[in-house]
């Protein structure tokens, strides 16, 4: 399957095909010098598969985790290109998750004012969200994505076969972003998650429309948008009511949920990409509509910054040894190497909850719990509020946020970091 992101001269294809990693040389122009960037948490064979298809590959493995989105690593990659005498006719390829894509994309955007960039995402989060849209960035001063550029890839290759090496927690981390898309823009996709959460399984296609219906829904206008004073409109399609999972059977029900979701992963990725594709085509540089993709991210980034300061970079991702141990394991294995700290998608899951209307929140929380995502967390509310003030969505006039009044709907509003801080008790663990 090929989806085209229609951006005029910057248009590009998203290739969704099992096994396309081995076809990278045929699908991308790699007959030149290529900087292949991956990280220590990605099975090295993925990057080597790409490198073997290049005329001249320079493979660099950075440390896994947010610490690699730094000025130092950014400079090291640029220096590698200088020393290898890369020209503007050469290119950069990212093979990894969102961190690798952000870093490598910004390197491509910066070297000689821009060289070709190809993105090959290897995590669910990157496949459903961060690999398309052109956002590239590194962190600065302890805050996420403070330095970056909008720089579109030449092509994105999505190979679902690479997901077989991911532990379940990494799958859940990515599915949080798919739930985000569903909440604001795709009631049928939310219905898929809700049915799985309620029953632990469903028949093929239950709660989902056809591929054509997915395209129609997206083309009709992603989600149901409104500004703070406007009325919202709904997409076609409805989601069924959820049944709260029995806490005593939470582990076994989570197993059932993932067993049910796994055959539908391609559908989840496709529908999420259709939502984001439509948004990016309408608002490439986040002047308006694209802000809906930040749903859950303002509070989520605040929690994430707090977590990184609290636990340190040793917990910024799974260890290389844990990743290698998971390499031969089946998809949806139960554990990974992180013992403390939250992943980005887990923080987004928390960040969505306070910004949903109460009836939406009542339906969202069972879905998040069924996926194994957090719905509460212990944190210092004042520290999280302070981090929100440094979020890139903050300005002198306040903080732009997305709220969810109803499934498949959204509003864009202005508020303050202090007002968001007042919402934090909804996700803050109560002291014993």
Residues covered by each model-derived region:
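ATP/NTP phosphate-donor binding region
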Residues: 1-91
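C-terminal charged capping/lid subdomain of soluble metabolic enzymes
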Residues: 11, 176-179, 361-432
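A glycine/threonine-rich phosphate-anchoring loop and its flanking beta-alpha core
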Residues: 15, 29, 106-203, 406
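Residue-level signal for inorganic ion chemistry
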Residues: 17, 36, 70, 121, ...
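Non-catalytic interfacial helical region
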Residues: 78-95, 104-119
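Short glycine/serine/threonine-rich phosphate/pyrophosphate-binding segments
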Residues: 99-106, 127-128, 301-302
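Active-site segments that bind and position negatively charged phosphate/pyrophosphate groups
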Residues: 200-205, 252-383
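Small-residue-biased low-complexity repeat regions
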Residues: 205-233, 241-242, 246-249, 319-321
């Amino acid at each position: 399957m090929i989806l085209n992101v229609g951006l005029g001269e910057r248009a590009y294809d998203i290739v969704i095909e099992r096994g396309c990693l081995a076809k990278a040389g045929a699908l991308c122009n790699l007959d030149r010098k290529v900087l292949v960037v991956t990280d220590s948490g990605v099975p090295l064979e993925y990057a080597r598969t790409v490198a073997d298809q290049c005329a001249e590959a320079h493979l660099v493995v950075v440390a896994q985790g947010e610490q690699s989105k730094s000025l130092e690593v950014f400079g090291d990659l640029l220096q590698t290109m200088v020393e290898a005498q890369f020209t503007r006719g050469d290119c950069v390829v990212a093979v990894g998750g969102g961190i690798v894509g952000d870093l490598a994309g910004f390197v491509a955007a910066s070297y000689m004012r821009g060289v070709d960039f190809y993105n090959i995402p290897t995590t669910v989060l990157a496949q459903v969200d961060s690999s398309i849209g052109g956002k590239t960035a590194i962190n600065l001063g302890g805050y996420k994505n403070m330095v970056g550029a909008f720089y579109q890839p030449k092509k994105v290759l999505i190979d679902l076969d690479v997901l077989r090496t991911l532990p379940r927690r990494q799958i859940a981390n990515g599915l949080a972003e798919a739930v985000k898309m569903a909440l604001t823009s795709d009631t049928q996709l939310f219905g898929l998650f809700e049915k799985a959460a309620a029953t632990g399984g469903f028949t093929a296609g239950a709660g989902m429309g056809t591929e054509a219906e997915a395209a129609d829904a997206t083309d009709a206008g992603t989600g149901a948008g409104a500004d703070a004073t406007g009325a919202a409109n709904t997409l076609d399609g409805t989601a069924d009511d959820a049944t709260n999972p029995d806490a005593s059977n939470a582990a076994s029900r989570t197993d059932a949920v993932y067993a049910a979701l796994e055959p539908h992963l391609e559908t989840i990725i496709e529908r999420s990409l259709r939502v984001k594709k439509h948004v990016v085509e309408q608002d490439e540089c986040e002047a308006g509509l694209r802000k809906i993709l930040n749903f859950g991210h303002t509070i989520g980034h605040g929690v994430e910054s707090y977590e990184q300061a609290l636990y340190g970079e040793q917990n910024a991702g799974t260890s290389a040894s844990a990743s290698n141990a998971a390499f031969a394991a089946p998809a949806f294995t139960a554990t990974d190497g992180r013992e403390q700290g939250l992943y980005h998608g887990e923080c987004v899951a928390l960040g969505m909850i306070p910004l949903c209307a109460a009836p939406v929140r009542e339906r969202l929380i069972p879905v998040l719990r069924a996926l194994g995502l957090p719905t509460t967390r212990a944190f210092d509310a004042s520290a999280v509020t302070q981090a929100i003030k440094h979020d890139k969505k903050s300005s002198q006039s306040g903080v732009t946020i997305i709220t969810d009044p109803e499934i498949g709907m959204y509003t864009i509003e202005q508020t303050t970091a202090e007002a968001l801080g007042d919402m934090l008790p909804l996700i803050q663990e109560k002291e014993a």
